[in-house]
Amino acid sequence: MIALLQRVSQARVEVGGRRVGEIGPGLLVLVCAEPSDTGAVADKLVERLLKLRVFSDDAGKMNRSVVEAGGGLLIVSQFTLAADCSGGNRPSFSGAAPAEQGRVLYERLLATARSRHTPVECGEFGADMQVLLVNDGPVTIPLVVGHDKLRP
C-alpha cells in the first residue's frame, strides 16, 4: 500500500459540502491499495502509522508517535498515489488496485486502525472529496508498505 501522511494541527474531509470526517492534531493519511496488497499489508501499514515518531517531544525532537501524542487519524482513499507519469503527459493509474479490491483493503485498514486507536475518521471511498488541512511543520512523509517493500 502507498500512503502519504501529513502531520496536521487540524484536517477535515467533505463530500458534496457535507463533512464526513474531521480531526484536530494528528495525521492525515492519504492511502492507495496496489494489486498485490492483502489484508496483512493493510494491517502492517496501520502498525507503521501508529508507531512512526513524527510528533515533537518536550525537547522539540520528532520522538513521539500519534498514539503518544494523543492525535487522531484521518484516513482518505486516493488511488492517484499510484500514478505513473513516465509515459507522457497523462498519468496512468494502472498501478492502483481495482476499485473493489481497493475498497475491501481500505475498509480493512479502517477497521484495524479503529481497533487499535481513537479517534480514527475517514473519507468516503470513491467519492469526489474536498480535503482541508493545516499542515503542521510541515511534515509530509511518503510510506510504502507491502510484502516485499517497506519504504522509508
Swiss-Prot record:
User: Primary place of residence?
Assistant: cytoplasm
**GO CC terms:** cytoplasm
E.C. code = 3.1.1.96
Give the reaction(s) catalysed: glycyl-tRNA(Ala) + H2O = tRNA(Ala) + glycine + H(+); a D-aminoacyl-tRNA + H2O = a tRNA + a D-alpha-amino acid + H(+)
In this record, what's one Pfam family? Tyr_Deacylase
Give the location in the cell.
Answer: Cytoplasm
Q: List the SUPFAM superfamilies hit by this protein, alphabetically.
A: DTD-like
* Stored InterPro entries: Daa-tRNA_deacyls_DTD, DTD-like_sf
Q: How does it assemble?
A: Homodimer.
Which NCBIfam families does this UniProt record tie to the protein?
D-aminoacyl-tRNA deacylase
The disulfides recorded in the entry are none
Kindly give the HAMAP family that the UniProt entry links to this protein.
Deacylase_Dtd
The domain comment in this protein's record states:
A Gly-cisPro motif from one monomer fits into the active site of the other monomer to allow specific chiral rejection of L-amino acids.
Q: What biological-process terms (Gene Ontology) are attached?
A: D-amino acid catabolic process
**Protein family:** Belongs to the DTD family.
Protein name per Swiss-Prot or TrEMBL: D-aminoacyl-tRNA deacylase
